[in-house]
Amino acid sequence: MAPHSVKSQFGSRLRQLRDERGYSQEELAERAGLLRNYVGGVERGERNVALENIVKLAKALSVTPGDLFSDFSR
């Protein structure tokens, strides 16, 4: 996988926001109604995230879905 793929950039941003809030992957997963290994896969850029799950993750982090894309390279 390319180091700057959309999935890896999204995963890095998700990890950054999770770390800023002091959440573990397990805590974020629970707040979002997802599985911990799913969240881990997203953070590693291994998962293609459905729109519904982007919204769930954003709500769990108290951000907008757009905030999950704010640090993307062009």
Predicted segments with their positions:
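Short basic helix-loop element that most often maps to the first helix and adjoining turn
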Residues: S12-E27, R31
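A detector for short, charged/polar N-terminal pre-domain segments
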Residues: M1-Q9
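Recognition helix of helix-turn-helix/homeodomain-like DNA-binding domains
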Residues: G33-R47, S73
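Conserved hydrophobic/aromatic packing and binding residues within compact polymer-binding modules
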Residues: L14, L28-A29, V39-V42, L68
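Short coil turns linking two alpha-helices in DNA-binding domains
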Residues: S24, L35-Y38, A50, T64
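DNA major-groove recognition helix of helix-turn-helix/homeodomain DNA-binding modules
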Residues: E52-D67
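Short, charged recognition helix plus adjacent turn
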Residues: A2, K59, F69-R74
